[in-house]
Amino acid sequence: MKGDPKVIDYLNKALRHELTAINQYWLHYRLLDNWGIKDLAKKWRAESIE
């Protein structure tokens, strides 16, 4: 499929931002879980999956 390179670039940037956000939520979930803050960790995990 061929597309406008500028549009594809914008979509790739948006995807990169979303994946970065997911990784940050997951990292914070793991840290909170490790520190014993289980209730907040569950919320961050759910947010990372959303």
Curated annotation (Swiss-Prot):
Catalysed reactions listed for this entry: 4 Fe(2+) + O2 + 4 H(+) = 4 Fe(3+) + 2 H2O; Fe(2+)(in) = Fe(2+)(out)
One Pfam entry name: Ferritin
Record key words, sorted: Heme, Iron, Iron storage, Metal-binding, Oxidoreductase
Entry similarity comment: Belongs to the bacterioferritin family.
GO biological process, any: iron ion transport
Positions annotated to bind Fe cation: 18
Designated name of the protein: Bacterioferritin
Protein function: Iron-storage protein, whose ferroxidase center binds Fe(2+), oxidizes it using dioxygen to Fe(3+), and participates in the subsequent Fe(3+) oxide mineral core formation within the central cavity of the BFR protein shell.
Cofactor, free-text remark: Binds 1 heme b (iron(II)-protoporphyrin IX) group per dimer.
GO MF entries: ferric iron binding; ferroxidase activity
EC class (word): oxidoreductase
Oligomer status and interactors: Homooligomer of 24 subunits, arranged as 12 dimers, that are packed together to form an approximately spherical molecule with a central cavity, in which large amounts of iron can be deposited.
Residue span, Ferritin-like diiron domain: 1-50
Listed cofactors: heme b
SUPFAM superfamilies for this protein: Ferritin-like (SSF47240)
EC number: 1.16.3.1
